[in-house]
């Protein structure tokens, strides 16, 4: 009998990008069977984005989020604009912000709280994590 659950800790750490991609494809093949799952911990967030349906993120012993990957990516957006634009958003819309190199502001926002028509970039899981950690440090 083959295993139905793999528990992996930093399974792709230290691998070169080509081998890492091949290992991720093996994992994807494993999970294509409905009764197969993988529980994986990793600092390589792009691997999690390629592999996982659900992502939980722990930071300094605190659970910052645990949700479906697709729901996370739909909930948040990246806005790049002026400080005045960002300051005009309703309370709670801006999750975290940083000054950008061109003198504007780059921030993680909750899509549902941003006016229609505002151009938002689709974040990566890494974008979301970095902004949430930075936001946690500022509070």
Region spans (language model):
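A short, proline-enriched helix->beta-strand linker immediately N-terminal to the Walker B motif
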Residues: 1-4
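A short, surface-exposed alpha-helical micro-motif characterized by mixed small hydrophobic
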Residues: 48-50
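Conserved catalytic loops of ABC-family nucleotide-binding domains
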Residues: 26-40
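ABC ATPase "signature
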Residues: 66-67
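Catalytic Walker B motif of ABC-type/P-loop ATPase nucleotide-binding domains
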Residues: 6-10, 15
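C-terminal coupling/interaction segments
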Residues: 94-139
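Helix N-cap at the start of a conserved alpha-helix in ABC-type nucleotide-binding domains
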Residues: 17-19
């Amino acid at each position: 009998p083959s295993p139905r659950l793999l528990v992996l800790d930093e399974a792709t750490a230290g691998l070169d990008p080509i081998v890492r991609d091949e290992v991720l494809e093996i994992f994807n093949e494993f999970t294509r069977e409905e009764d197969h799952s993988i529980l994986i911990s990793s600092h390589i967030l792009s691997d999690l984005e390629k592999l996982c349906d659900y992502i939980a993120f722990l930071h300094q012993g605190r659970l910052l989020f645990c949700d479906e990957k697709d729901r996370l990516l739909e909930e948040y957006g990246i806005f790049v604009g002026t400080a005045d634009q960002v300051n005009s958003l309703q309370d709670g819309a801006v999750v975290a912000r940083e000054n950008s190199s061109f003198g504007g502001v780059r921030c993680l926002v909750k899509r549902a709280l941003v006016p229609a028509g505002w151009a938002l970039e689709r974040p990566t899981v890494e974008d979301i994590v970095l902004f949430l950690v930075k936001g946690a440090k500022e509070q």
